[in-house]
Curated annotation (Swiss-Prot):
Residues annotated for FAD binding in this entry: 13-18
Family: Belongs to the MnmG family.
Its job: NAD-binding protein involved in the addition of a carboxymethylaminomethyl (cmnm) group at the wobble position (U34) of certain tRNAs, forming tRNA-cmnm(5)s(2)U34.
Binding site residues for NAD(+): 282-296
GO BP annotation list: tRNA methylation; tRNA wobble uridine modification
Name the record gives this protein: tRNA uridine 5-carboxymethylaminomethyl modification enzyme MnmG
Keyword Flavoprotein: yes
SS bonds (residue pairs): none
Cofactor: FAD
Subunit structure and binding partners: Homodimer. Heterotetramer of two MnmE and two MnmG subunits.
Source taxon at top rank: Bacteria
Keywords recorded for this protein, A-Z: Cytoplasm, FAD, Flavoprotein, NAD, tRNA processing
Organism: Persephonella marina (strain DSM 14350 / EX-H1)
GO molecular function per UniProt: flavin adenine dinucleotide binding
Amino acid sequence: MVYDLEYDVVVIGGGHAGIEAALASAKLGVKTALITLDKEKVGLMPCNPAIGGIAKGIVVREIDAFGGEMGKAIDATGIQFKTLNTRKGPAVRSPRAQADKEEYRKYMVNKVLNTENLTVIEGEATDIYLKESSYEVEGVEVDRRLKIRAKSVVVTTGTFLDGVIHIGDKRIPAGRMDEKPSTKLPDFYRKLGFPLQRFKTGTPARLDKRTIDFSGLEEAPGDEPAPKFSFWTDPEHSYWFRKNQKEQIPCYITYTTPETHRIIRENLHRTALYGGAIKGIGPRYCPSIEDKIVKFENKERHTVWLEPETKNGISIYPNGLSTSLPEEVQWEMYRSIPGLENVVLLKPAYAIEYDIVPPTELYPTLETKRVKGLYHAGNFNGTTGYEEAAGQGLVAGINAALRALGKEPFYIRRDEAYIGVMIDDLTTKGVIEPYRLFTSRSEYRLHLRQDNPVLRLYRKAYNLGMLSYEQFKAVEEIEKEIGRWLDIYRNERRKIVSKGETRSVSAYDLLKRPDIDVNKLKEYGFETPESDYVAEEIDINVKYSGYFERERKMNEKMRYLENIKIPEDIDYSQIAGLTKEVVQKLTAAKPLTLGHAARLEGITPAAITAIMIHLQKLKRLKA
């Protein structure tokens, strides 16, 4: 075949997964193309105008630790910043920000258009070419005419694959409102026998701010000082709070009423969801308002957050009110809510159905098991959220570039990052509904905190080529400083009087007390670090040292299994002691390590022992 263009890596889709995939690939020095229908819509926020949230905000900081862009973008374009769960322990805290969605989009458009090694090509990816007589990527077709050769292809099509919008009984083929769906690419997947699942999500109407009465509503301001997402924003200041405070725009809170619920109940049969038009599975943790009314019928009211979509614009996003009701019923429903009695809808709410490929079709590198050099990321893997998509995009983009360079693939383990937890969940367990990340999904959540992503990941990022030497040395120095102060606090002692007795106590032991932090050590005659960030890390490390030790021991056991690799060509039917069911599951899943195999549903400890014995036999035979 004659190709018109040639790139090392081609990324299909300019959403949040596609952006991080393309930027990561380009950063590793390979010639990269990003194919998108409209370059001016790169980085668009089609649903909520926000970045972060529980676990999701930590993912953004992990992306940043690998040199990704999402954290920098939201720091530059956010209009309200909060830290969630501040009254709880450090394991569950997480940053969240309201974005000026137009400024965020412009930031990302500018970034992809001005990145070395990256070219943006407008058009629809209509086919993926394979090498003759093999299941290996060779190129991509655009608009049924342009042929692009590629060593690796990353598919990040979001909700576009055979996407259909539902508003009441209206059915509109679309990938997003006013954007055509991808109808050609699904043929490639069907032809190769990839299974497809049908998922559904939705978005609320957009409201005209000028027609809302905010006077009786509860104001929800941002935090002061405002948290930030990128370690490198104001780096000379406290590492997770801004030096230069930005003006923050408040959100407002209102609630549904019994009248709201009556309108919805009387029109349930007219919704696409309950009227039978939608067959796709919707997100459990972000249900439509009609779903809430049905499933929580005894609840008197549901919270609605009124979130500005831009700093100076008129559009308000009513978080909590997505629906597939007919448009005329939507007007009635929205106007039954306090503050919205005279509201004007700028755009109607809608539900959208789309196809995904089950993520069990992927290795933990996000490469497909059926086709070499083909990677998937984002909603196409069955996840929800910009942050989950971006995290997958980063991993897929790095691995696509490494493959093009002929290098070994890259993995993130469960104990290293929430990105690793998510990818392991997806590729091991699969999805029966849109997947959302929570801190509760991780057994290592005390280690995977919001304050330490760069400390956890900077060495791995630097070794990959995703961080500069200057960045590496900056973080290394912080890590060394934390270690120095911990040594000082273990060894330095002061005499204190307690219950009439004088005794010698180390700073380390004092810090174990819940009422004493690093700053309070001054009262006992100890010196303290200048950096607030170093002080915070010391405080957490000491107070939770017992829990960390427990996590470390558990981690050692799991890492032992993770380090035992399983050959790609292994024949499980030849392993004594495995049942037929176990053989079928292992053959389908193709686990890369014994740890991966151990996490598969239905794989018993006895089966893992049998595989380990078999691998030891193979090793002896080769010796």
